[in-house]
Amino acid sequence: MGIKGEETYVNDIKRIVTDDKEKFYNYMNLKLTGLICEEPDWLANLSNASALLWLLLDEINWAGFYLYKNGELVLGPFQGKPACTHIAIGNGVCGTAARDLETQVVKDVHLFPGHIACDAASQSEIVVPIVHEGKLMGVLDIDSPIKERFDEADAKGLQKFVDTLNKYMDWSKIV
């Protein structure tokens, strides 16, 4: 990789500055593929995925995963402040996304019935369910201290992020 005599680092990921969300998410998914495509360990992959989100997404205060285990969501790899460790299916934004198997774009978390406040600074949230071969594996959860931070373009881009995870992850090692 790289030019002879130059060192290339796996963590040499540059931030991209663009107003084009499709271009941004395509770039981020390319970087995710590079990080996880040859790594079989699920913990390493989800850890790097959450670190990548933390590095590249602006105006967020939490990014990570909850994994579906024993009928509930259990905290997985993340970046940000310590978080709730268990979430019941149907509770809060994460539990709702898991129950309905639908992405939740919440422009103001204070208006979401039953919102679970792990960080008082959070104002908006997006949660994408991770479904593999028809089964719930968990959710991708991202919080922002900015109201209306997330929109449908983010939902589409983050769904592709989850699709990339599904392409390379061996979920059988987790559940």
Where in the sequence are the language-model features?
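Intrinsically disordered, low-complexity terminal regulatory regions
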Residues: G2-P77, T164-V175
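Regulatory sensory and allosteric helical modules in signal-transduction proteins
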Residues: I60, Y68-C118
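Short hydrophobic/aromatic beta-strand element in the GNAT-like acyltransferase core
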Residues: W62, V127, V139
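A short, aliphatic-rich beta-strand micro-motif
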Residues: S124-V131
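Sensory-domain boundary capping and coupling elements
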Residues: V131-S144
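A generic structural motif
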Residues: I146-E148
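Amphipathic alpha-helical "output/dimerization" segments
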Residues: F150-Y168
